[in-house]
Amino acid sequence: MPKMKTNRGAAKRFKKTGSGRFKCKHNHLRHILTKKSSKRKRQLGPKFFVSAADHKRVVACLPYA
């Protein structure tokens, strides 16, 4: 049986933690930032964890994570 392929786009976006959860960065924080409030940009700053609803999909994309 051939090796499973890792989804390279997902590999660049998600990192697995020691507890098995996946962390990633918020979107909407790359450009066109002048119209966004300081509060909104600050809240988008820290990393967040993938929800339980999406966890199965991320695991399927990253078989060796």
UniProtKB/Swiss-Prot annotation:
Annotated PROSITE patterns: RIBOSOMAL_L35
Statement: the UniProt record of this protein carries the keyword Ribosomal protein: yes
BP GO terms, sorted: translation
Keywords, ordered alphabetically: Ribonucleoprotein, Ribosomal protein
GO cellular-component term (any): cytosolic large ribosomal subunit
Pfam families: Ribosomal_L35p
Keyword Transmembrane helix: no
UniProt-recorded Gene Ontology molecular function terms: structural constituent of ribosome
NCBIfam families cross-referenced by the UniProt entry: rpmI_bact
Family membership: Belongs to the bacterial ribosomal protein bL35 family.
Protein name: Large ribosomal subunit protein bL35
Gene name of the encoded protein: rpmI
